[in-house]
Amino acid sequence: MKKISLKTFRKSFNLSKSKDETEFMVVQPQSLAGDFVKDDSLFGSCYGKDMASCDIGSEDEKGKNRSKSESLMGTLKRRLSAKQKTKGKGGTASTDEDTFSSASAPGGLKDVRAPRPIRSTSLRSHHYSPTPWPLRPTSSEETCIKMEMRVKALVHAASPGPVNGVRKDLRELQPRELRDLQPEPRPESRCSPSSPGDLSLHLEEHVPVVIGLMSQDYLQYTVPLDDGMCPLEGPRSCCLDTSSPMEVSAVPLPGASGAFSEDDSHVDQDLVVGPEILVDSSVNNLLIGTTGVMLQSPRGGHDDAPPLSPLLPPMQNNPIQRNFSGLSGPDLHMAESVRCHLNFDPNSAPGVARVYDSVQSSGPMVVTSLTEELKKLAKQGWYWGPITRWEAEGKLANVPDGSFLVRDSSDDRYLLSLSFRSHGKTLHTRIEHSNGRFSFYEQPDVEGHTSIVDLIEHSIRDSENGAFCYSRSRLPGSATYPVRLTNPVSRFMQVRSLQYLCRFVIRQYTRIDLIQKLPLPNKMKDYLQEKHY
């Protein structure tokens, strides 16, 4: 028997291995791969990761096994031509132009935005030159240069997103960072939010166009349910109180008062439609060409608790500790003295708490002016305090059109709301407050008043000659309601119980956190701390 030595076995293994490797002209990356990627000016970023990482010494050895009629560049041309022929059967002329070696990335716009091409090895291996070679119709060896220039243009898209992180400098991104880039999928039916040069179209938003008015001159209110626009199950005929600036609801049906609980506020948001209010240009030109009203969508959630009062705040389970760290010296002392003197608890009062926070930037005079206005407001008969919208509708049920009252807003982000009658319906709109000015619209700084009382009195004077504004739904073909404030509904016309009046006075002059220290029975303390006074 013939003995096979270990040397003979190794020689036969090397021969078989060299035969297999003659079909491929690139090998696994070696230590020279990093040097080829760094020097972009020599190779023009034309070659892929596999070509740039070839070992020169090993190529010299493999040259012995290569056929004499086939060179390295000839093999590359043959592979490129075969690849282009395969792609050309199912693609267009534009895709054929971008076809190149398998080490490059696809050139479609959809693929560039997708997560996979971002994590691909081509983006990590190619080194993009800040001044790429000019495009010109040449041989297939330079096709990869055209592809890289197109990929760079696609990556430099103007729309925001994680893909734009690649356009800063690809050489600074590590492979791990490229794997972490996950662009969110974008729907095809609309344009994503983009920079000021891009087109942004939202197909589901239908803002009506009115002759003589612009789309920004609108305010929202909810659509009345009895018109069939916003149906709810059961006998209810009122829209829920949401964060839209203008809201509409019908008069409660007899015997259906028990259905108007605060728990009903948790409904699907698609049941609430955001409408607008527009100003008649022939009566009042406050809004025409001067305001830029933002259309707000209803807020995502509602509180189970009834609305709170900025004048008589209830107890808060989790009070937020507020301080005036932005002030020092006499300003800090003045802010603290104002807060104590006004008997306000900023931790529990809705809307007022954010005003106290603004002291750090605007100074304590903002809080002082707001407090003085609220004190003047408390003396007005048409101010009813923290009543709900359902209670306001009950008080406005049997009164003529033009009747109104002012109440505390049920939204924590706002102070007050106006409830008024128009065409047999009760509408609700908020009173905006910004920098010490009040208005029914979303830009108090432009057409607002420095006093709430002045705002109401000015609206009453404008209503003497007719409606000073109109409310209308955003839905096409919806009804339009004229807005007039002619008959204030005063709370002084109703005499409440002595117990109610005592609680009203105590809550007006006693901070909520000091009620437990009063020398009163526990039952009386609990009654004083109830959310309605």
UniProtKB/Swiss-Prot annotation:
SOCS box domain mapped to chain residues: 484-533
Give the span(s) annotated as Disordered.
54-136, 177-199
Tell me a GO cellular component. Answer: cytosol
Where is the sequence biased in composition, kind Basic residues?
Answer: 76-88
Q: What is known of its domains?
A: The SOCS box domain mediates the interaction with the Elongin BC complex, an adapter module in different E3 ubiquitin ligase complexes.
Coiled coil: which residue ranges?
none
- Residue ranges with Basic and acidic residues bias: 59-69, 177-189
Pathway this chain belongs to: Protein modification; protein ubiquitination
- What's the name of its gene? Socs6
| Native source organism of the sequence | Mus musculus
Where on the tree of life does the source sit, at the highest rank?
Answer: Eukaryota
Q: What is this protein called?
A: Suppressor of cytokine signaling 6
UniProt xrefs under SMART domains:
SH2, SOCS, SOCS_box
A single Gene Ontology biological process assigned to it is: protein ubiquitination
Sorted alphabetically, which InterPro entries does this protein's record hold?
SH2 (IPR000980), SH2_dom_sf (IPR036860), SOCS6_SH2 (IPR035865), SOCS6_SOCS (IPR037345), SOCS_box (IPR001496), SOCS_box-like_dom_sf (IPR036036)
Annotated SH2 domain residues: 382-489
